[in-house]
Curated annotation (Swiss-Prot):
This is Ferrochelatase. PROSITE patterns: FERROCHELATASE. It catalyses: heme b + 2 H(+) = protoporphyrin IX + Fe(2+). Belongs to the ferrochelatase family. It comes from the Bacteria. Signal peptide: none annotated. The gene is hemH. The keyword GTP-binding does not apply.
């Protein structure tokens, strides 16, 4: 029997090509038009998106991107490319490509590169530790949609998530412990996850449970009393209720409870991006300090840390053997 030619597709959310209103508008239009992300009727949503949201938000969000943009480009893309390079170096016998659900490098090009190399078994690795219909399922949809254009399909191994994987928890633990060594132990360690509308969870999305699974596993490994480790949700958008407690409201309330020193990590982000570097590290730090807090330290995402690449390699090799 002919041996399968293996390949890996790493997928993250995406980013604008530049920190400009025009580039941000293109990116947000693609992102917010995905029915997995916003499931409001297109007849209602698209006029609102194009007529109100994009014209107002694009210049505002572009300024935020400008504050975190790196010499090499968007932080999310920079760190994702470093992850791809590091994983490819670990597995030189297997082609590894990076694609973004929205923006560039796009998924069709990444898949085309892999199939052009003769890949017959494809491992799809969404870089989302906790499954959600708005992220991981959107990757599934996109890959299936792209492959409809091919006559000859590869077999697919889809990594749904890795919320409790021992190597993932170990990498998070190491990041937290490094922060404790550098800054001392805080009064509270805050685990801030990206939020989703409560309605999505009520309709069956198990994302909240997967966030709780990660938090529970990490609490068991961290040298702090369990009551000093908190879980919150950030980045809410729109008017409907999202998962609570909200990160910003929690940070605003902590100083009045005697909490003066916090450290915050975002376990659901595999790479630093606008939501971690600007929303958390800058905006939410200001919220905490303005409310009377004294010390705030942001613990970076796993990015291309060795422990993170160890995890990604283990995930892929486990699925290649399936």
């Amino acid at each position: 029997m002919k041996q399968s030619k293996l390949g890996v597709l790493m997928v993250n959310l995406g980013t604008p090509d530049a920190p400009t209103p025009q580039a941000v508008k293109r990116y947000l239009a693609e992102f917010l038009s995905d029915r997995r992300v916003v499931d409001t009727s297109p007849w209602l949503w698209w006029p609102l998106l194009r007529g109100v949201i994009l014209p107002i938000r694009s210049p505002r969000v572009a300024k935020l991107y400008q504050s975190v943009w790196m010499d090499e480009g968007s932080p999310l893309l920079v760190y994702s490319r470093r992850q791809q390079k590091a994983l490819a170096e670990r597995m030189p016998e297997i082609p590894v490509e990076l694609g973004m659900s929205y923006g560039s490098p796009n998924l069709p090009d990444a898949i085309d590169k892999l199939l052009a190399q003769g890949v017959t078994k494809l491992v799809v690795l969404p870089l989302y530790p906790q499954y959600s219909c708005s992220t991981s399922a959107a990757v599934w949809d996109a890959v299936a949609r792209i492959l409809k254009g091919y006559r000859r399909l590869p077999s697919i191994s889809f990594i749904r998530d890795y919320a409790e994987h021992p190597a993932y928890i170990s990498a998070l633990k190491q990041s937290v412990e490094n922060s404790f060594v550098q800054h001392g132990k805080p009064d509270r360690l805050v685990l801030s996850f990206h939020g989703i509308p409560k309605r999505y969870a009520q309709l069956g999305d198990d994302y909240p449970q997967r966030c709780e699974d990660t938090s529970r596993a990490l609490r068991a490994e961290i040298a702090l009393p369990a009551e000093q480790i908190m879980m919150t949700y950030q980045s809410r958008f729109g008017r409907e209720p999202w998962l609570t407690p909200y990160t910003d409201e929690t940070l605003k309330s902590l100083p009045s409870q005697g909490v003066k020193h916090i450290q915050l990590i975002c376990p659901g982000f595999s790479a630093d991006c606008l939501e971690t570097l600007e929303e958390i590290k800058e905006q939410n730090r200001e919220v905490f300090i303005h409310a009377g807090g004294e010390k705030f330290e942001y613990i970076p995402a796993l990015n291309d840390d060795k422990g993170h690449i160890d995890l990604l390699e283990q995930l892929v090799r486990d699925h290649l053997s399936c």
